[in-house]
């Protein structure tokens, strides 16, 4: 027979602390709102992911995979899955990743040439290996073992893109501290002598609405299960062998069922410096709202990279979501589901933070220092 002592203690606590009872009732009654969130304004792909999620519980993995496949087939952002995003040598490659919020298991591929369905290969890494990331030829070999056929994707479009880029003196590119000067001339390049190295300056990778090389999806179901996924054709004119944020856990995607998840998009090399998706989830773990977590992450990135272009979307375990961004007037993302919404695949917009409100001088000194009386103390 159970002792009545624990029940008596609980009753005493409820009598002396009424707020505890309200808190417990709130926790018991709080509902998880299923939601699919994706970066940028591609509604069809988000709707396809939602159509999978609403079929029933435990469909989050297939939902985010379907979203990535839809964008690949629909050529979301023109660069994705097509022939318009080559590296500087004219090669086409893909990267993709998926993470399970139950245990943070992660599968990814990067720099994978000749294979079209990168997100399915990333899922195969998760399911059929003890590894987290396969790159380059090794990723292609693994895809063949998994039954995926190689395709020669380079075509006339790719050759035209490279031809126009070369005619424009290989601008933009991702070289620095080399000769000849990479901002005015094409390579081949060689390192500058040490005594000629200049103060580090970075030509920020531009982001234009409708011209994206990366997309990310988050799916949360009514049981609180979360999966996140990302898919990218890589920054145009990148160096061959470059790995982007899509394939790095915590940079483009991160999820923990106990807290929530986050997805990010923007300059991948900067995102890999700071792991904003991971930081957003940890901020929510510390008690911050999705809106506060996303804003704080963007502020942190800006303080170290004053010209950063990008965004992060944070979603807590209940389905509340928010986004923050920098480097654009506003950031668009698509949401299906969530609390109190009937219309699916709705495009939501968030006004981006003004750099000058965040950066006080900055490591590169792009902005005039604010007067001391106006400085915000955190």
Swiss-Prot record:
Cysteines engaged in disulfide bonds, as pairs: 71-76, 170-186, 325-352
Assigned GO CC terms: lysosome
Keywords (A to Z) from UniProt: Disulfide bond, Signal
Domain of life of the organism encoding this protein: Eukaryota
Source organism phylogeny: Eukaryota, Metazoa, Ecdysozoa, Arthropoda, Hexapoda
Protein name: L-asparaginase-like protein GF11609
Homology family: Belongs to the Ntn-hydrolase family.
Signal peptide start-end: 1-21
Keyword Ribosomal protein: no
MF GO annotations: N4-(beta-N-acetylglucosaminyl)-L-asparaginase activity
